[in-house]
């Protein structure tokens, strides 16, 4: 079933022999599921309701730190209490480094025989290895594009809204401007705009988030953004936090934002708006998913139950319930959205299309910066403000802000994270 399972059983047998603690094996069918997600009272109650249809599950919400400490301690002891682990992608490199997780490649193959999973997310679960599946993707949240249907008539000839390029988005925005006399593309500069820069623009043009920060490709990207896109961005964008209100008010016709900050537009007027994936650049279709995965520790007392529960969590029916009740989007194909609100169903289609794009390039939230995570956001925002709003020299700005970025990486020791290639030690800019 699981690769390396023999190793775990040998350890457990040694423990049993030495201590007589036969209780390390699970009795009955109970599965203990520890998760860093759904750890508020309201969310955990909803999660338990979903899990109740599987059977006897002990759902244990946890913060990341205590979960890691527990799994490390149980690995060292050779016996455990946790069967299934649910956590953000960024938790799994730590668990992999401690060597506490089964390789789930065989289980993944079984699941993929039944359901379609985004290949980009499957690769993330390998954590840079060739064939060791540390986790199987469970659910996602992300940022997408939205447009009023009145804007569709201005799409460039031959453009596919589900496979746009950044150049086509700029041409679309220009066409709208030429026809209406107004800049109608909206960006949440006062909101989560740093994620737009980190997870969408930079990966699409440079192939990474960090290493290519000051490269020739980055310079070309900023030149394009400043001259070809920004002139057609609504001037009030610098004050926009959420894009759903400007869309509903008709101030903008096309917008980028987090799904949670667009949902009101789709729910209130589903007949007026469409959702679609972010555009692609020369290096791919950069996008920033919040990927949550499921893993099974070597010390799981009930690994068979963990496998069955993992399969249950990835069934289209369960994925639909998680979306409806807990607002995380599915990672499997075939999810029935007919019972969901119109807005959620509209967004789900775009989220799925984005993750399953052949050129999908997932850019993960910064990893390894600890309490200084906010500093990287300021560096990208400063680059934007200085280049686009203040008109400073692009290369000069990138050299200066790049030095700040490298200092942050060096001082925290943060290794590179996807889509940048793994690094030994602190991530280094090119």
Set out the residue ranges of the language-model regions.
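Extracytoplasmic/periplasmic solute-binding protein
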Residues: 125-143, 162, 167-211, 217, ...
């Amino acid at each position: 079933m699981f690769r390396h399972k023999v190793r775990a059983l040998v350890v457990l047998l040694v423990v049993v022999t030495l201590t007589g603690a036969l209780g390390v094996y699970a009795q009955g069918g109970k599965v203990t599921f520890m998760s860093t997600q759904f750890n508020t009272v309201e969310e955990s109650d909803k999660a338990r309701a979903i899990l109740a249809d599987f059977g006897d599950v002990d759902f244990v919400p946890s913060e990341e730190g205590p979960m890691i400490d527990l799994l490390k301690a149980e690995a060292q002891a050779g016996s455990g209490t946790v069967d299934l682990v649910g956590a953000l992608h960024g938790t799994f490199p730590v668990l992999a480094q401690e060597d506490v997780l089964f390789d789930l490649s065989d289980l993944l193959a079984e699941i993929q025989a039944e359901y379609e999973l985004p290949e980009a997310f499957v690769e993330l679960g390998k954590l840079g290895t060739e064939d060791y599946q540390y986790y199987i993707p469970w659910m996602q949240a992300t940022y997408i594009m939205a447009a009023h249907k009145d804007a569709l008539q201005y799409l460039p000839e031959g453009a596919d809204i589900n496979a746009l390029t950044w150049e086509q988005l700029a041409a679309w925005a220009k066409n709208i401007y030429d026809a209406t006399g107004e800049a109608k593309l909206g960006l949440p500069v006062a909101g989560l705009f740093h994620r737009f820069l980190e997870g969408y623009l930079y990966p699409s043009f440079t192939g990474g988030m960090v290493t290519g920060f000051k490269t020739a490709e980055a310079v070309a990207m900023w030149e394009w953004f400043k001259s070809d896109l920004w002139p057609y961005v609504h001037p009030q964008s610098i004050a926009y936090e959420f894009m759903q209100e400007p869309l509903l008010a008709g101030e903008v016709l096309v917008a980028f934002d987090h799904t949670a900050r667009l949902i009101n537009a789709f729910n209130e007027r589903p007949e007026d708006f469409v959702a679609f994936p972010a555009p692609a650049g020369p290096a791919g279709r950069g996008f920033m998913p919040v990927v949550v995965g499921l893993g099974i520790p070597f010390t799981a007392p009930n690994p068979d139950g963990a496998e069955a529960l993992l399969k249950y969590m990835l069934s289209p029916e369960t994925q639909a319930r998680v979306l409806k009740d807990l607002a995380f989007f599915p990672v499997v194909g075939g999810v029935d959205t007919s019972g969901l609100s119109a807005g959620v169903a509209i967004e789900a289609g775009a989220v799925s299309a984005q993750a399953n794009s052949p050129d999908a390039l997932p850019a993960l939230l910064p990893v390894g910066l600890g309490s200084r995570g906010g500093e990287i956001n300021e560096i990208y925002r400063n680059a934007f403000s200085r280049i686009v709003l203040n008109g400073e020299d692009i290369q000069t700005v990138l050299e200066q802000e790049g030095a700040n970025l490298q200092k942050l990486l060096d001082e925290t020791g943060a290794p590179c994270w996807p889509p940048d290639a793994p690094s030994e030690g602190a991530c280094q800019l090119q």
